[in-house]
Amino acid sequence: MSSGGLLLLLGLLTLCAELIPVSSRQRHRDCDKPPDKGNCGPVRRAFYYDTRLKTCKAFQYRGCNGNGNHFKSDHLCRCECLEYS
């Protein structure tokens, strides 16, 4: 990863941490649902939260009719689904 990419990632992580205080953070309501790849559109890489492993994992998402446990990046998945207790 280039230094510009690392700086961007660091900035996003900082922004996520600063905008939402840890004590008041609530998880996305669909984080506990199993991954659902959907059934239409082109296949693209997305991320879902794995409740058993307590981490975000990549999967193939088809763009519609899935549940809300899909995110465009690992970072967004972690921001929305990691437990803050």
Swiss-Prot record:
Please state the protein's primary subcellular location: secreted
Q: Where in the cell is it found?
A: Secreted
Coiled-coil spans are none
Q: Which residues form the BPTI/Kunitz inhibitor domain?
A: 31-81
User: One Pfam annotation, family name?
Assistant: Kunitz_BPTI
Tissue pattern of expression reads: Expressed by the venom gland.
MF-aspect GO terms: potassium channel regulator activity; serine-type endopeptidase inhibitor activity; toxin activity
Cited SMART domains: KU (SM00131)
Keywords from the UniProt entry: Disulfide bond, Ion channel impairing toxin, Neurotoxin, Potassium channel impairing toxin, Presynaptic neurotoxin, Secreted, Signal, Toxin, Voltage-gated potassium channel impairing toxin
Q: Which CDD domains match?
A: Kunitz_B2B
Show which residues constitute the signal peptide: 1-24
The UniProt entry's GO CC annotations, sorted and at most eight, read:
extracellular space
Disulfide bond found in the keyword field: yes
Which residue pairs form cystines in this protein?
Answer: C31-C81, C40-C64, C56-C77
**Tell me, how does this one assemble?**
Heterodimer; disulfide-linked. The A chains have phospholipase A2 activity and the B chains show homology with the basic protease inhibitors.
State the family named in the UniProt similarity comment for this chain: Belongs to the venom Kunitz-type family.
Function, as annotated, reads: Beta-bungarotoxins are presynaptic neurotoxins of the venom. The B chain is homologous to venom basic protease inhibitors but has no protease inhibitor activity and blocks voltage-gated potassium channels (Kv).
The name under which this protein is listed is Kunitz-type serine protease inhibitor homolog beta-bungarotoxin B3 chain
Organism of provenance? Bungarus multicinctus (Many-banded krait)
